[in-house]
Structure formats: structure tokens, C-alpha cells
Regions:
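Non-transmembrane functional regions of envelope-associated proteins
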Residues: 1-157, 198-202
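Extracytoplasmic
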Residues: 104, 156-160, 164-170, 176-202
Length: 202
């Protein structure tokens, strides 16, 4: 049985997913969905409440580039002071930007990018920092490696230059020989409806 709705589903379903994963024993919930901007007050309040109750969620942001004005902006999870909504009040955040090669295959990742002269974490780095109890600012970029929360990542991938602010974008190749089906999968609808095996989440 699945949800009778199209993607993106109303945010109340995301609230159910977060709450059910938390109740199932998930140590960390990494949510690769950008919750920017408002939807309905009821749905936004429901998601805000679930995030604040869970306190173990990492959300997604996006770096937007204006190539005409040569400026960057950070599209972050939603907040509304009048309604008391702040999705980041009890959650972490990391940018979702995954480089692909010419054949559209993902072989490397970007652990961090520079935004307004500060190194900010990718979604994967933010998840690692949250899991290990480190601060989001615990990132150092050196000539041949990156240190994220005390973990050294060799800069084995190419370093490209951001066309907007000319900042270096370091990358590292991933050692992941496995394919689809390596990890067990559960549908969004099953988790939202609380019809899933809890064993794989604790």
C-alpha cells in the first residue's frame, strides 16, 4: 500500500516519515529533500513540529548561482517568524550538489564548498559531522586533503573553479564498487504509513 498523492507529497507526510523513523530507532535521519518556501500553514507546522521533536535530522540546502550578477545565494529550509516555524531550529543542513562526469556517472563527491568566504558542508559531510557530534564549522581545506570532523579526505578528484566567485571546489573520488540493491530499500509511502520493518533502522 502506498500514498495516494503525487510527488512532492504534502509536508505532513514528511512529518510522518521523520516521526516514524525516529520511533523506529534511527540514530540519524538524512533528508535529501529541499524544504524551501512555504506550502500550507498546517503542513508546514506539522513538519516543523516533527523536526523539533526528532532533533536528529539533517536537511538539504542549495547554492544558487546568478551568472549575470556573479553572485551566490543559499536556498535553505523554510522559516516563518509569524507562525513560529524554523525548520533549522533543531536540524542540521548541508548542500546537495553532486558532480557528474561527461557520461553522467557519479564517481566523486564534493565534501565542502565556499560560500561567502566560509567552507560549508555538503549533505554527506553534514551527516558525518552530526553523527560524530562535531560542529558544522569543523572543516579545513588544505592543498592535498580536506579534514571534516577530524576525518581526512584526500583530494583525489579534480579541483574546479566556481565560475561565479572563482572559489576552488575540491572533490574526491568515491570507492564504491557495489551497485543497485546493495542496501535494503523501503518506500516513502511505507514509512509514512508506518508499514515497514523497523529492524533495519535501529
Amino acid at each position: 500500500r502506498d500514498l495516494d498523492t503525487r510527488w512532492p507529497p504534502p509536508r505532513r507526510y514528511h512529518a510522518d516519515v521523520i516521526r516514524n523513523l525516529k520511533n523506529a530507532g534511527a540514530t540519524l535521519i538524512v533528508y535529501d529533500v529541499l524544504f524551501s518556501g512555504p506550502t500550507t500553514p498546517e503542513d508546514d507546522i506539522a513538519l516543523d513540529k516533527a523536526l523539533k521533536e526528532a532533533v536528529n535530522v539533517v536537511l538539504t540546502s542549495r547554492i544558487d548561482r546568478n551568472f549575470t550578477q556573479l553572485s551566490k545565494s543559499l536556498e535553505e529550509p523554510h522559516y516563518d517568524d509569524e507562525l513560529g516555524i524554523d525548520f533549522l531550529a533543531a536540524a542540521r543542513v548541508g548542500f546537495a550538489e553532486v558532480p557528474t562526469d561527461a557520461d553522467q556517472i557519479v564517481r566523486r563527491f564534493v565534501p565542502t564548498m565556499k560560500f561567502r568566504d566560509e567552507w560549508i558542508p555538503s549533505l554527506a559531510s553534514a551527516a558525518f559531522l552530526a553523527f560524530t557530534g562535531k560542529e558544522e564549522t569543523d572543516i579545513q581545506v588544505e592543498r592535498d586533503h580536506i579534514v571534516v570532523g577530524g576525518q581526512t579526505i584526500p583530494r583525489t578528484g579534480p579541483t574546479v573553479i566556481d565560475l561565479v566567485d572563482k572559489a576552488p571546489v575540491p572533490s574526491a573520488y568515491m570507492d564504491f564498487p557495489a551497485g543497485n540493491g546493495t542496501f535494503p530499500m523501503t518506500s516513502f509511502g511505507q514509512v509514512a504509513l508506518d508499514e515497514f520493518s523497523k529492524v533495519q533502522f535501529n
